[in-house]
């Protein structure tokens, strides 16, 4: 278990915007998972929250979230536009995490800071669950970017986001493997469902 902010890079969180999957619970204990940006600038940590999201509401209520580090493109797609089954969640050291996470980190957000879009976050503890060496896969990173664009398209209905997703799809077709291409196909399905709702 890691408790020192100076060792947070061991959990896969570096300077810049780290796209993670946040796990939270609502007041009834129902789990939620959604992609979210954890921003690290030296020793300063903040999160990007969007009004109207379950994640923001749950963080407001509880004052905390767990950042799950993953390189699974399908997990980002499913959590961006869909509710995942409860069996995908597991409790570790008293905190709600994802069963497929490679690492997790618990953060606190003070309720007084949550009325702004970029509240500061405080690292509490975390754990590395698996250490796999991998080269950078452009396809995985682009699927994550497409999932973010899809959430914005569904919320705002701006064609700019749709054009971005089409551009990304072409590159994923060249740079990604079968998992990334399958994740993009699933993203299309989930976007259609979200738009029809």
Give residue spans per PLM region.
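Basic, polyanion-binding surface patches
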Residues: 1-104, 108-197
